[in-house]
Amino acid sequence: MVHLSPLLRPLAAFSFFTSLASTESIFPDCSTGPLSKNNVCDTSLDPVSRAKSLVAAMTLEEKINNTKYDSSGAPRLGLPAYNWWNEALHGVAEGHGVSFSDSGNFSYATSFPMPILLGAAFDDDLVKQVATVISTEARAFANGGHAGLDYWTPNINPFRDPRWGRGQETPGEDPLHLSRYVYHLVDGLQDGIGPERPKVVATCKHFAAYDLENWEGIERYAFDAVVSPQDLSEYYLPSFKTCTRDAKVDAVMCSYNSLNGIPTCADRWLLQTLLREHWGWEQTGHWVTGDCGAIDNIYADHHYVADGAHAAAAALNAGTDLDCGSVFPEYLRSALQQGLYNNQTLNNALIRLYSSLVKLGYFDPADDQPYRSIGWNEVFTPAAEELAHKATVEGIVMLKNDGTLPLKSNGTVAIIGPFANATTQLQGNYEGPPKYIRTLIWAAVHNGYKVKFSQGTDINSNSSAGFAEAISAAKEADTVIYAGGIDNTIEKESQDRTTIVWPGNQLDLIEQLSDLEKPLIVVQFGGGQVDDSSLLANAGVGALLWAGYPSQAGGAAVFDILTGKSAPAGRLPVTQYPASYVDEVPMTDMTLRPGSNNPGRTYRWYDKAVLPFGFGLHYTTFNVSWNHAEYGPYNTDSVASGTTNAPVDTELFDTFSITVTNTGNVASDYIALLFLTADRVGPEPYPIKTLVGYSRAKGIEPGQSQQVKLDVSVGSVARTAENGDLVLYPGSYKLEVDVGQDFPTATFTVSGKEKVLDEFPEPQQNATSAVTRWGR
């Protein structure tokens, strides 16, 4: 989300510049003036009653004018304009509802690593800490008149295809990992699980099955994602189920694409039957926004309905409450006159929106709201700086090391490549200006190194004009660092990749550097992976790190790893596929399981990876032992009966305990990844393995051990039937820890008859008469 369809981009530009023009208070005056006479200002009433009072006082024109992301308010009532569109993917981000000052207060915010790198840390507590800081800074910007209270983050679509331009915005490819990430992120952003008074509103996007931008001429605006109930339930929806049902996020964004023939923002089954009814997401102040231009796409790109009036009605009737675009304000009056929706449907949408603002304290006296006291002094604090650094260090993954790292001494280092002196490139997308960005060169100097710098080549250049200078710099150095990979000229919103090789002639330059027989370290940046086969095979490349988009702390964090100040412990949150993979399956094929024209997707269904999901090396060695070799036995009846009022799939199946021992010489964190395999259990085909739990053990000293407890939910042991039902099957199961290690395994059995834990609502079928679906 952010790039609009062409019809709406001038509108977005106007909104952006008008938002920069004012830093007045965003809050209404409930003490004097006309709004004080409305019960929306009566703090003794519940949020819904207060919102109903406000909506009841609006004229039809005022109602319609407030269904748009930059709502005009109602001056007659004393209701100010409000911008619902604010961004904070990895820190408060510039544009639309958010404005940064040119200097001084509110001219910067903390910039954390992009979610793909934060996801590589596999640290749920860290995710919550990062989200807590982001929400505090977001609230400070709102209180200072520089932003709204609603933030359209996080992106929790799983990173299914390595070519996806927006994979960098997600924590990875695994649905359990995404689900735990979003639970803790929403907890930190909203300040609790379903709080009566959220600090800010988070928005889980893009609902659903959205992971294509523009591939081979197929654009997201018109793409129809054809997904089976099994893949939908098992892979594309779990993170959204956790976000809404369990974490109780206050907002959801429907996506550009169609799902099985129906645009998601016009899909009543998706937004009403599944989201609100089946997942129980009907609490006060929960609302749905369309992605920016998505309601326009219903008729202009998907051709699902005949015109704008039918598109507006289709979206409103399906359960979309807010339009990030102009279709609602332009066509809702005409649609009402045609009888395409009723007035109460419009009222309900506005009540959901304004009851959310009531919960946020938008209409309350500042003295009654603890979050209203958050100010500029809580932005970019020393603790936030340290957390950004820590988050970056925790996520960096070591992919190769022949003993070159950690660096043994100072001396002269040649830093070469397009990321050698990069600044904003390190941030990825949806970024705001930080106070500083630490480059690799800055970090080298501050670690006592003499630096020889030469860029050598660009990200996607085929010119070798800079090679000679780079080779000369390398010859004068004791150690060579090549910093390259991909950036947002290669992968971004609106742009997928067509290949997953290193772009341009970067590998040619690395090859020539490797011939110098100097210690050579390659630091790979970018959200998506590239095929590292040649680097892994090249004996002249001593070490290889993946650093994602590390943001403000980037160079400093990388040098902490290079010098051994910190030990690498991150794990790949995605599969690194061979370059040939893109020739085997089109991006448009949404199927996960292997077939005649699909080699399979993600580590669960594909086993020919260059580097597998969960891979990551250390400066030390570890041993893992089970505290029990066998667990159970378990019975489907007792397991499926549940012990609390929580959904049974979230209940604890068991806690599996292991002992992790540092058998090397360097203190280090260790991420315990727990995978489940089963012997012909459930429907065919059978997954290679499934992540069912993880935990990051911190600071294990040489020779020391830590007990690690891995909680596994009932839903993690279950499998998904072809109709989408979540089913617990009897059978024999095996547990293994880590990737590519020969650690002992544990086993357990489940007896009894198969038990359905969750009946997946039957998806509606695409109707051929879609144009008339929303008629009288």
Curated annotation (Swiss-Prot):
Query: What are the subcellular locations of this protein?
Result: Secreted
Which EC numbers characterise this protein's activity in its record?
3.2.1.37
Database matches in InterPro entries: BXL, Fn3-like, Glyco_hydro_3_C, Glyco_hydro_3_C_sf, Glyco_hydro_3_N, Glyco_hydro_3_N_sf, Glycoside_hydrolase_SF, Ig-like_fold
Q: What Gene3D superfamilies does this protein's entry cite? A: Glycoside hydrolase family 3 C-terminal domain, Glycoside hydrolase, family 3, N-terminal domain, Immunoglobulins
Q: Taxonomically, which superkingdom?
A: Eukaryota
| Molecular function as annotated in GO | alpha-L-arabinofuranosidase activity; xylan 1,4-beta-xylosidase activity
- Kindly give the SUPFAM superfamilies that the UniProt entry links to this protein: (Trans)glycosidases (SSF51445), Beta-D-glucan exohydrolase, C-terminal domain (SSF52279)
| Broad EC category | hydrolase
Per UniProt, the keywords (alphabetical) are: Carbohydrate metabolism, Glycoprotein, Glycosidase, Hydrolase, Polysaccharide degradation, Secreted, Signal, Xylan degradation
Q: What start and end residues bound the annotated signal peptide? A: 1-23
| SS bonds (residue pairs) | none
The free-text function statement in the UniProt record for this protein reads:
Xylan 1,4-beta-xylosidase involved in the hydrolysis of xylan, a major structural heterogeneous polysaccharide found in plant biomass representing the second most abundant polysaccharide in the biosphere, after cellulose.
Report the sequence similarity comment from the record.
Answer: Belongs to the glycosyl hydrolase 3 family.
This one is known as Probable exo-1,4-beta-xylosidase bxlB
Q: What is the lineage of its organism?
A: Eukaryota, Fungi, Dikarya, Ascomycota, Pezizomycotina
The gene name reads bxlB
